Amino acid sequence: MIILGFESSCDETGVAAVCTQRGLLAHALHSQIAMHQEYGGVVPELASRDHIRRIVPLTREVLAQAGLRREDVGAVAYTAGPGLAGALLVGASVAQSLAWSLGLPAIAIHHLEGHLLSPLLADPRPEFPFVALLVSGGHTQLMRVDGVGRYVLLGETLDDAAGEAFDKSAKLMGLGYPGGPALSRLAEQGDASRFDLPRPMLHSGDLDFSFSGLKTAVLTRVKAATREGALDEQARADLAAATQAAIIEVLAAKSICALKQTGLKRLVVAGGVGANSLLRQRLAEVLPRMKATAYFPPLSLCTDNGAMIAFAAAERVKAGLANLEQGDHAFTVRPRWDLAELERG
């Protein structure tokens, strides 16, 4: 079966075609970063309008790339949440309309399940069970994954997500949007040892995270350096390096602890922060000593994208967990949706 997937939960419009037998056939993505830069963050109304402009041309592009006709598609999938309500409605409306017009089933997919399963698109593909570190702008969670639809929450952030810590710290340093990648680039020129920053909950004994205290510590350092007239470019680079080092140390340590507690030897890292080179380097150094392996999605699939949505739908179909009845195509979106609430069937 060929599944056409749509992602529009925030500021990326993604469309992809996935075959349940052959895998990813084609995908296309449009990022709204340039549009939102002048505002310093995502403007929901502008995001929704841009999704409307982009989603149909991207769909045509994917069908052309894969050499498909509309009649070749066997099902349609879309992100139903969590995300921005207006943005979600664009993708859901297009997906449901297309499914209705072609007489196809429409499969609602949890955005985080898309991220969670995206490393299965990599080669080699991790086998179940594994520990998953789901780390993005809005979420930081450790999950035990025993199969498609079989997820157990091990730990999560109690306040800010890791991606938020990157973005908010970058904003405090006067860096542009998106802040996380800008901070990571600047950190390459810095000395992390110049600033001593806290590692919140590093030794808490559980698998939860907290990054709000780190953000406060960065604010304190920025204010102090500004008062002293010492917040020059090198100081900002050093502070960026120290901030990144603190976040990555906590993420890596908690992931290692999760592997030890579960006895598993496979760690899957998913979400936008999974593209961070220091995180990849740190895990690549430490995990082999534990005879464990880290798996990452391809860099092009770390951000939000349609491929992960179409692929998650394909995995659900193969596992017998997707509702393939056409129904009346009435739908809702869920801006807030805990992955633990996800039904298996």
Curated annotation (Swiss-Prot):
InterPro entries xrefs: ATPase_NBD (IPR043129), Gcp-like_dom (IPR000905), KAE1/TsaD (IPR017861), TsaD (IPR022450)
- GO MF terms on file? iron ion binding; N(6)-L-threonylcarbamoyladenine synthase activity
Q: Where in the cell is it found?
A: Cytoplasm
Where does this protein hold substrate? 134-138, 167, 180, 276
Q: A Pfam family name for this chain?
A: TsaD
Record: residues binding Fe cation:
111, 115, 304
Q: Which residues are the signal sequence here? A: none
UniProt-listed GO biological process terms: tRNA threonylcarbamoyladenosine modification
Q: What EC number(s) are associated with this protein in UniProt?
A: 2.3.1.234
CDD domains referenced in this protein's UniProt entry, alphabetically: ASKHA_NBD_TsaD_bac
Co-factor requirement: Fe(2+)
Cellular component terms (Gene Ontology): cytoplasm
The record's free-text note on cofactor binding: Binds 1 Fe(2+) ion per subunit.
What keywords is this UniProt entry annotated with? Answer: Acyltransferase, Cytoplasm, Iron, Metal-binding, Transferase, tRNA processing
Look up the domain of life of the source: Bacteria
Q: Which reaction does it catalyse?
A: L-threonylcarbamoyladenylate + adenosine(37) in tRNA = N(6)-L-threonylcarbamoyladenosine(37) in tRNA + AMP + H(+)
The record's NCBIfam families line, in alphabetical order, gives: gcp_kae1, T6A_TsaD_YgjD
Family of this protein = Belongs to the KAE1 / TsaD family.
- Function noted in UniProt: Required for the formation of a threonylcarbamoyl group on adenosine at position 37 (t(6)A37) in tRNAs that read codons beginning with adenine. Is involved in the transfer of the threonylcarbamoyl moiety of threonylcarbamoyl-AMP (TC-AMP) to the N6 group of A37, together with TsaE and TsaB. TsaD likely plays a direct catalytic role in this reaction.
> What name does this protein carry?
tRNA N6-adenosine threonylcarbamoyltransferase
Gene behind the chain = tsaD
